[in-house]
Structure formats: structure tokens, C-alpha cells
Regions:
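Charge-rich, low-complexity N-terminal segments
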Residues: 1-103
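Hydrophobic, Leu/Ile/Phe/Ala-enriched alpha-helical segments that form helix-helix packing faces
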Residues: 85-93, 152, 195-202
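Active-site-proximal segments of catalytic enzyme domains
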Residues: 102-107, 121
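Short, conserved beta-strand/beta-arch hydrophobic-aromatic motifs that form part
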Residues: 110-162
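Well-ordered alpha/beta subsegment
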Residues: 164-203
Length: 203
């Protein structure tokens, strides 16, 4: 298969990601989806890969509070990266429309449209909702395929959601640490893509 590298719409981001990929050998030779541009062109399907090429996250894991409301307490970085991630995901095909970012509430559920969502409940937090972003204490919830969830946890990008361990959310539900820079934004885009395709019935 032809190797694709992640392409960002913002100037300068691609150059930073290119340097990062050559500094992290796990990324070289792996398929990194052209997430932001390709999905904006309604070509999310061809942008999709697995997460087996995830690098190991640098630095310590953020502190979290584990409980029914499982939240990330620190290490958020500049929230412009989280905002950019959310705004991009909301442009993907078959995502239900949402209000502009400035008018959103403290919780942003990201759902597939009814026509696109699979009937598998293990792919969703609630009905057709594969991702949820908390803004009060910035936190990302994603439902991932189990192998992908395992890799994201082991390589430092996520931790199991408390309610998943209690059987109240799908086993692949994780708390993904919010991106602090363009490199982490790229990895979060890969994880969102895996979650998005897990719930789609029309891939």
C-alpha cells in the first residue's frame, strides 16, 4: 500500500509533523491518514488506518480523576489544538451538525447520523455517539476498537474510562489526553478516525 503522510491545512504544521516523523522511528513507513484535508473532501474512508503506527507519547501522563465523571486535571496545553480537532471532526461526512464552537455547552457529543451508524452498541458511548468532549475540564472520551485502545493506553495517549471497567460503557472507551501541540493533534486525529470508522456501517 502507498504510504500517506498527514497533511494539515495550516501552514507550518506539515513541516513540524515531518520533522517529528523522522525523529520517531515507529512512524516511518506507516500509513498516517491525510485526516484534515481528505476528510474535508468527504474521503474519510480512504484516509483511515489502524493505530499500530502510534509513537510513544513523550512526557508524563496528565493527572486525572477516575470516577463516573472521569476527567483530565492538568497537562491540557493550548486549547486551540483541542478546538481545531473538534472543528475538523465536525466537518467529516455523516457527522451530525453542531452549533459553532463559541456557542457550545460544556459537553460536545459527536454522533454519526442515523443512516451511517452501525447497530453495534459496543461502538458508542450513547446512541450513535462515538466521542464526547468536556470543555469545563478539557477531556476527550472515545470508543476505540480494543486493539487500538490497548495501543493508545500502552503508548501513553490514553487510559481506560472508569465506567468501561464497571461495564457501564463499552470496553474500548478511553480517556484520550488532550493535544498540547501539532504533533499530538496528529495522533488524536488518528484515534478519532479509528473511533469514527468503528461506528460506521457504510465503510
Amino acid at each position: 500500500m502507498k504510504t500517506n503522510r498527514l497533511v494539515f491545512q495550516k501552514s507550518g504544521a506539515l513541516a513540524q509533523w515531518s520533522r517529528f516523523s523522522f525523529e520517531n522511528q515507529e512512524l516511518i513507513g506507516t500509513e498516517i491518514p491525510q485526516t484534515l484535508e481528505m476528510m474535508h473532501k468527504n474521503d474519510a474512508r480512504s484516509a483511515r488506518i489502524g493505530s499500530d503506527g502510534l509513537p510513544t507519547r513523550r512526557g508524563r501522563r496528565p493527572k486525572t480523576i477516575r470516577g463516573p465523571l472521569h476527567i483530565q486535571c492538568n497537562g491540557h496545553g493550548d486549547l486551540k489544538y483541542l478546538n481545531q480537532l473538534v472543528d475538523e471532526v465536525l466537518t467529516w461526512p455523516y457527522i451530525e451538525s453542531a452549533q459553532p464552537f463559541i456557542s457550545r455547552s460544556n459537553t460536545i457529543p459527536i454522533r454519526l447520523t442515523e443512516m451511517a451508524a452501525s447497530s453495534d452498541p459496543s461502538a458508542f458511548i450513547t446512541d450513535r455517539e462515538f466521542a464526547r468532549i468536556l470543555l469545563g475540564a478539557p477531556t476527550i472520551y472515545l470508543v476505540l476498537p480494543l486493539p487500538c485502545a490497548h495501543r493508545a493506553i500502552v503508548r501513553g495517549w490514553a487510559e481506560p474510562h472508569y465506567l468501561g471497567s464497571q461495564g457501564l460503557m463499552p470496553a474500548g472507551t478511553v480517556v484520550v489526553y488532550t493535544p498540547k501541540d501539532v504533533e499530538e493533534l496528529a495522533v488524536c486525529s488518528v484515534l478519532f478516525s479509528d473511533s469514527y470508522h468503528l461506528g460506521r456501517k457504510i465503510d
